[in-house]
Regions:
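Cytosolic regulatory domains of K+ homeostasis systems
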Residues: 1, 15, 36-42, 50
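The conserved cystathionine-beta-synthase
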Residues: 1-3, 9, 28, 48-68, ...
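Helical hairpin unit composed of two closely spaced alpha helices linked by a short loop
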Residues: 7-8, 13-21
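Glycine-rich acetyl-CoA-binding "A-motif" of GNAT/NAT acetyltransferases
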Residues: 15-18, 78-82
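Bateman (tandem CBS) regulatory domains
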Residues: 20-23, 34-46
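Short low-complexity, flexible loop/linker segments enriched in glycine and/or proline
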Residues: 22, 36-37, 86-87, 100-101
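Beta-strand/loop-dominated core regions that host nucleotide or nucleotide-derived cofactor-binding catalytic loops
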Residues: 31
Length: 101
């Protein structure tokens, strides 16, 4: 899957925010923009998923925030990765198929 959202982390791995490729695309090849910090493009994610959060809690966050991709962090806000709503739904679908067989 192609990803359009990227994490911005500090030297300790803490999540500072996210950057959406669509927000960068227009400026990516403009030499006058090369010196600009990534923080100029950074936004806060709609929410974060804690690494030990229940699937039910994760799905509620996806529904509440009307989003398909959220960052996963540990208790110290260190970035661990992204999780997508579609990946969870696909895994759920696979489990249903196994149960029905």
């Amino acid at each position: 899957a192609r990803r359009n959202i990227f994490p911005v982390i500090d030297n300790f791995g803490h999540l500072l925010g996210i950057v959406q490729l669509d927000d960068l695309r227009e400026d990516m090849f403009k030499h006058e923009k090369y010196g600009h910090p990534i923080s100029d493009y950074m936004i806060q994610p709609p929410d974060k998923i804690l690494e030990h959060e229940s699937i039910q809690g994760v799905m509620e966050k996806f529904e509440d925030k009307h989003t398909w991709m959220l960052p996963v962090v540990d208790k110290q806000n260190r970035y661990l990765g992204f999780i997508s709503k579609s990946r969870i739904l696909n895994a759920y679908r696979e489990q249903l198929v196994k149960i029905q067989q």
